[in-house]
Amino acid sequence: MAHTLPPLPYELDALAPHISKETLEFHYGKHHQTYVTNLNNLIPGTEFENLSLEDIVKKSSGGIFNNAAQIWNHTFYWNSLAPKAGGAPTGKLADAINAKWGSFDAFKEAFNKSAAGNFGSGWTWLVKKADGSVDIVNTSNAATPLTTADKPLLTCDVWEHAFYIDYRNARPKYLE
């Protein structure tokens, strides 16, 4: 089964001025597409050839895992963003965040601090734990909560390609 680049849920310029059209053209159109192309080149004739993307991520290793996980992580990331969105959550998520950090503002501070300190390339996630609590988890490279008992709720891509065009080496500015 050939995998395809999922469409963005918004136009390439919809996240400006926070994330520019140029960044999305490279990040989505080049990096994300390359992971799709690489995966499609790696899986023919393997046990992964006819599996769903999530199953490939959960069952593979090496290059197949890296490319499949990066497709999944990026798709989740694009769907974590929206034009003219943001603000504090409501309901059970707000309750869980307040129970852990005391306030949404304190959560944002903790999330940004964790993401800024995530060494090298990787991802910072808000996850729901098996006991229903929430936590912030940093992963390196292509690692993803999809391979753990944690349920991803939100992610931020902290690979340099996610922010370098717009923010150069100022990861904290990107996180704002």
Language-model features, listed with the residues they occupy:
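Feature for soluble, non-membrane regions of globular proteins
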Residues: 1-176
